[in-house]
Amino acid sequence: MKHVFSVCLVIVALGVTAGAQAAAAGACEANGKPAKLNFTFNDLNNRKIALSDFKGKVIILDFWATWCVPCKAEIPGFIDLQKKYAGRGLQIVGLSVDDSLPTAKKYADAMKMNYPVLLAEGKEDILMAYDPIPSIPVSVVIGRDGKICSRHLGIASMDVFEKEIASLF
């Protein structure tokens, strides 16, 4: 009987641990910092777009550049997420950190990017606002409440993004 109790206790402990890990993997921090959305950039049509225009939506800010191979690898996944979740309030925003308008526009057109691409070239203040951005890609997930849910340095799995944004709808 003692052996059966021990086995049951181990099974319960493993179940609780696995459940907590699964919840943590898909949930956002309850005490996320407020996202700084007080920045305005030109888009690929040379129109001024403010990040604050996207308040009330679930936002993925993607810091990237045309020469960045991991950035290029992530873009098709972001295109798919935008298609799948736009109707539920997702807005992916690409921030091209060091490309000129003609270079970024040509690249975005070739990649068939279906979300706003904003030119952040020479805008070090945005890089500092989301903690120092040491390298790219960096993606920041922001909830409808304007709080940062997560920050991904380097390439991240679209499954991870999907779990995070699902917890925000």
Model-derived features: positions:
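Positively charged n-region of N-terminal signal peptides that target proteins for export
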Residues: 1-4
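Bacterial N-terminal signal peptides
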Residues: 6-16
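N-terminal "domain-start" segment that seeds a small globular fold
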Residues: 21-52
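Short pre-active-site segment immediately N-terminal to redox-active cysteine/selenocysteine motifs
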Residues: 57-59, 63-67, 135
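Conserved redox-active cysteine motifs that mediate thiol-disulfide chemistry
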Residues: 63-80
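Conserved segment of the thioredoxin-like fold in thiol-based oxidoreductases
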Residues: 83-123
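Thiol/disulfide oxidoreductase modules built on the thioredoxin-like
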Residues: 107-114, 120-166
